[in-house]
Regions:
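Active-site proximal beta-strand in glycosyltransferases
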Residues: 11-41
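Membrane-proximal helix-turn-helix segments that form the acceptor-binding/catalytic region
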Residues: 38-59
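Donor nucleotide-sugar binding/catalytic pocket of nucleotide-sugar-dependent glycosyltransferases
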Residues: 54-107
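Conserved donor-binding/catalytic core segment of Leloir-type glycosyltransferases
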Residues: 99-128, 134-138, 145
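Short alpha-helical segment that forms part of, or immediately flanks, the ligand-binding pocket
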Residues: 159, 181-186, 197-201
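Short alpha-helical donor nucleotide-sugar binding micro-motif in glycosyltransferases
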Residues: 159-165
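Aromatic "clamp/platform" in nucleotide-sugar-dependent glycosyltransferases that forms part
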Residues: 172-173
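Short hydrophobic beta-strand element within catalytic cores of glycosyltransferases
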Residues: 190-193
Length: 204
């Protein structure tokens, strides 16, 4: 959000003490994210992301995995800026899971009768590996394999589908948080996720 930079400029020029808080979810520093995958010249994106980091007084990340990914992408080789690593670390806050409110939000979808549905709840992107999901479909005809984004679902329709499914599936190569497995577990749908990325902290 470019407003953050404008706010920081004005505060410093007016010598006003403010605190800016930023929540990080993804960026070009992650080579598996579509920003890291599709943007070829990352000199401008990584410099902007570093600038945003230092504009924030507090930078919030849900997992240690994301923190390590962020530091490696923006402050590791070839960026020779280890001289202010202490300043980097003091600006980082690991929050843990930030979405406890979902339990109450999804209350009405709990204890729904289960159908033989396995759900793919992610965006259709290479880093989400939907082809693995389709391969499983060919070998497990007793289940209905549904890719949520292939249907025009309202939020209520999606949550009903999540509540009816027996399993929510991920073979992701990119995940810094992972909301869909958590939503699934709240409505008694079993999460099937890999032991990597943020999943190793959040699920396993």
């Amino acid at each position: 959000n470019s407003t953050v930079i404008q706010l920081k400029y004005m505060a410093d020029l007016l010598q006003k003490k403010i605190n800016i808080h930023g929540l990080w979810h993804a960026g070009s520093y992650d080579p598996a994210d579509f920003l890291g995958r599709l943007i070829e010249d990352k000199r401008w994106t990584t410099n902007i992301e570093r600038g945003m980091f230092f504009a924030y007084d507090y930078n919030y990340f849900a997992t240690n995995f994301h923190i390590e990914l962020f530091i490696k992408g923006l402050f590791g080789p070839p960026h020779d800026i280890s001289y202010h690593r202490e300043d980097v670390m003091k600006r980082i806050v690991r929050t843990g899971w930030p979405m406890e409110y979902l339990d109450e939000t999804l209350e009405q979808y709990k204890r729904m009768p289960k159908k033989n549905i396995i759900l793919f709840p992610h965006r259709m992107a290479p880093e989400k590996q939907p082809e693995i999901f389709r391969d499983l479909k060919d070998n497990m005809p007793q289940y209905e394999f549904i890719i949520a984004q292939e249907r025009q679902l309202t939020k209520n329709e999606y949550h009903n589908l999540l509540g009816e499914a027996k399993l929510v599936f991920s073979a992701n190569l990119q995940e810094t948080l992972g909301i869909s497995w958590y939503e699934g577990s709240l409505v008694d749908t079993i999460p099937m996720v890999p032991d990597r990325l943020s999943y190793s902290e959040m699920v396993l």
